């Protein structure tokens, strides 16, 4: 299984992406957390309130998930991080049957 870590501009955007992926059965679950981000953008130190969207999915769906996120995301360059994880058998079985 994989976890995808995606930063979004707000709850509305994160929920839109999560619901789209759930409806297409590309993910098993989504978690949304408020965060504060610091980064350099166009030569300027920037501080923003954002939202992290964590997606739990099967690795075989990664490419399709990435394509959908890019279509729905408002950022010019969205961060879509993929983390391979080992999970308990029961959860993986549940996720495969979604």
PLM feature spans:
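Positively charged, small/polar-rich N-terminal and surface patches that mediate targeting and assembly
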Residues: 1-98
């Amino acid at each position: 299984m994989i976890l995808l870590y995606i930063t979004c501009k707000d709850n509305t955007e994160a929920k839109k992406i999560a619901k789209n992926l759930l409806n297409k059965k590309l993910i098993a679950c989504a978690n949304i957390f408020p965060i504060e981000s610091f980064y350099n953008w166009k030569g300027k130190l920037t501080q923003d309130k954002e939202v992290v969207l964590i997606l739990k999915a099967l690795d075989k769906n990664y490419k399709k998930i990435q394509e959908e996120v890019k279509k729905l995301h408002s950022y010019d360059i969205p961060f879509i991080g993929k983390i391979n994880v080992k999970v308990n058998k029961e959860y993986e079985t549940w996720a495969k049957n979604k």
